[in-house]
Swiss-Prot record:
SUPFAM superfamilies: Translational machinery components. The gene is rplR. This is Large ribosomal subunit protein uL18. Disulfide bonds: none annotated. It comes from Prochlorococcus marinus (strain SARG / CCMP1375 / SS120). GO terms for molecular function: 5S rRNA binding; structural constituent of ribosome.
Amino acid sequence: MSTLSRKQKTQKRHKRLRRNLSGTDQRPRLAVFRSNNHIYAQVIDDVAQNTLCAASTLEKEFLSNSKVNASTCAASTAVGEMLAKRALGKGIKQVVFDRGGSLYHGRVKALAEAARQAGLTF
């Protein structure tokens, strides 16, 4: 039996991912954080160390337009579409996807596919 908790395993995977993954001004990093109740996504330029745009299930835009629970795949899809729209508005078309140590499945996958369909390429 493993002595690492689920959170520690996620942090270990995220460290391993971030070793080879960084965003630039031409191709920023799309970072996803998934909690039990919400999902957050940011487009980050690691060279300049600033966030170019962000979206989450805690925003007024999401809460006022959506009648779905924030911890569902439908909510993640809405966040992915919001983020892609904001990124395209700032002229960002290509990103590097950072799943944040979470498995590419469920809510993380729904956010990524929605962002792709809205126009981001990765």
